[in-house]
Curated annotation (Swiss-Prot):
NCBIfam families: HDIG (TIGR00277), RNase_Y (TIGR03319). This is Ribonuclease Y. The keyword Hydrolase applies. Gene3D superfamilies: Hypothetical protein af1432, K Homology domain, type 1.
Amino acid sequence: MNLLNLLLILLGIILGVVVGYFVARNLLHQKQLQARQTADDIIKQGQKEADNIKKEKLLEAKEENQIIREQTESELRERRGELQRQEARLLQKEENLDRKSDLLDKKDEILEQKESKLEERQQQVDAKESSVQTLIMKHEQELERISGLTQEEAVNEQLQRVEEELSQDIAVLVKEKEKEAKEKVDKKAKELLATTVQRLAADHTTESTVSVVNLPNDEMKGRIIGREGRNIRTLETLTGIDLIIDDTPEAVILSGFDPIRREIARTALVNLVSDGRIHPGRIEEMVDKARKEVDDIIRDAGEQATFEINVHNMHPDLVKVLGRLNYRTSYGQNVLKHSIEVAHLSGMLAAELGEDVSLAKRAGLLHDVGKAIDHEVEGSHVEIGVELAKKYAENETVINAIHSHHGDVEPTSIISILVAAADALSAARPGARKETLENYIRRLERLETLSEGYDGVEKAFAIQAGREIRVIVSPDEIDDLKSYRLARDIKTQIEDELQYPGHIKVTVVRETRAVEYAK
């Protein structure tokens, strides 16, 4: 039983192995068939894709080939067109050259004909010239025989006669040309000046020698006078200006020929009236303050003038000196306004003539700068102006314009001449100046200068319209006895050197002050 089971089991195993072998072989065969089928499919698909890629590449190559062919054909067409155009131009040039060649041939023929004719004429002229020379020699011999002069003598006599006639004609012609040129120059100058003057619109007010200070009421007049007149005397002594207190309601008149001192007095008095405290100590403070205010006004006036004329890079001290001209008059004409007017005129004239407008304006503005301090420094305003310009390193053209505008020296530039012309235009304008006021001021300045020429004199003020000269002396140098002697010496010199109507009162003021401060 056991053996039979074993045999059955062994037989079953063998049968299982055989069956498994055949099953596995069948499965393997099926897989191989599937693999071959898959490989065939992949190969077919690859061939299809390769065919497609090949077709696409062929199409792209055909398209590129077509584009290249079209571009090549286009370039060939353009080159053919350019060659055709060049050929046409060459043909045109060839035709032009042929025409020019024909013209040159014709001209050569004409020239040859003309040369032939000229040779014939030259032969005829030579023959006639020979005949004329023979006749001239015969005539000269006949003339020498008749006149008794040789040919050389006759020629010299004829030349002398012709020279005399030409000299007269030349003299007449030169005179006519000079007259014509002068008329043209005069006409042009008149047109130039007329145009320049019409372009300038300047306003001027005649300066006077008085200023008026309005008061809040007439009671203020008594306070200004002060106890026993000490306030008014202090103000007059410190400023050198006359205070006229009369029946004019609510007003005090300040009289003085020096506009700067008069402005200082006016400013101080206005401040005193506004402040209400009027006594000698306060008056001194206000006068000092007024001097500083007027200095600021002077500086502002100078800066405003340079700004108006558009002049730059001027030394600040020279600008301040220029501003002092606002308080200076010449024959009643404000000198600063006159200088501005001259600057404008000089600039316009320079522009018309093509000169440096800026330099001409600068020279015109500074031409009278010496008048700002001519009553303080010896010398004419021209000399003082030249020294100021040199001191503050002004341009040589400006210095010459200042020096030559009154004819003291010869002008060295066109600008100097233009400044002198502009100065004359401004001064000669109707109503610009008044002779009487200028003479009056010069007389008062001369009176002050004469009095200040003595040792120990600190300041001198001409007041009462020149009827009194008030001399302030140093108490350390002048005692009471010398004060009387000084007054007498000044009186004698005034009588000897000045001409004046009526009498002039000489007052010598000697004041000693002792000041201490309690701490």
